[in-house]
A protein has these predicted regions:
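Conserved PLP-binding catalytic core of the aspartate aminotransferase-like
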Residues: 146-194
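Conserved core segment of the aminotransferase class I/II
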Residues: 73-148
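Short, electropositive alpha-helical surface patch
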Residues: 35-37, 64-77
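A short acidic (Asp/Glu
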Residues: 25-30, 57-65, 91-92
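Active-site phosphate-binding strand-loop segment of PLP-dependent enzymes
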Residues: 1-56
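Amphipathic alpha-helical segments in well-structured domains
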Residues: 29, 33, 64-68, 112, ...
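Alpha-helical subdomain
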Residues: 33, 55-64, 117-124
Length: 194
């Protein structure tokens, strides 16, 4: 990945999957995120985070958002597309957030102006049900705490299912090395046979 970031034209928009990577299940470590940030800064790339599975990697919203916070603290201007379709079970409701992070007030105003134009022309009246559910969960302390517990349960179940699949494949003597199943994170797994 580092080689690809270095080879990309300076100032490229780089889409980064925040956590529980789809389709590989392979997430960068914190040390790898630091290196990714260094290369993105050197090449003057623009990071755009896809945050579709927050909470599914570790069961902890804050832990899963570490890379975004690191980039923000490092002073990056960036975008984050955050979906609540999976982690709040709001499939088909189009519930999510778009975050633009900048330390420049003029840039923020310009981006907001463009987003308002796009929103008005593209989705003048978005579905409200999913947004209201998400807002209720995010703004009510009791619901928010319950949601965080549910995410821990779901991610724990995913981890347990990975272990059980791995153990069954080993028990059956299935040819190959299946350790990637328990090393990967989230709902997705990629196995490449060369």
């Amino acid at each position: 990945m580092i080689e690809e970031l270095q080879a990309a034209s300076e100032g490229s928009i780089i889409v980064l999957h925040l956590c529980a990577h789809n389709p590989t299940g392979v997430d960068p470590t914190r040390e790898q995120w630091v290196k990714i940030a260094e290369v993105i800064a050197q090449k003057k790339h623009f990071p755009f985070f896809d945050c579709a599975y927050q909470g599914f990697a570790s069961g902890d919203l804050d832990n899963d958002a570490w890379a975004v916070r690191y980039f923000a603290d490092a002073g990056f201007e960036m975008c984050v597309a955050q979906s609540f379709a999976k982690n709040l079970g709001l499939y088909g409701q189009r519930a999510g957030c778009f975050h633009f992070i900048s330390h420049d007030v003029v840039t923020k105003a310009r981006v907001l102006s463009q987003l308002e134009i796009i929103q008005r022309s593209e989705i003048s009246n978005p579905p409200i049900y999913g947004a209201k559910v998400a807002s209720t969960v995010l703004n009510d302390e009791l619901f928010f705490r319950e949601w965080k517990e549910n995410l821990k349960t779901m991610s724990g179940r995913i981890i347990e299912m990975r272990k059980r699949l791995y153990n069954k494949l080993v028990e059956l003597g299935t040819p190959g090395d299946w350790s990637h199943i328990t090393k990967q994170i989230g709902m997705f797994s990629l196995w490449v046979r060369l």
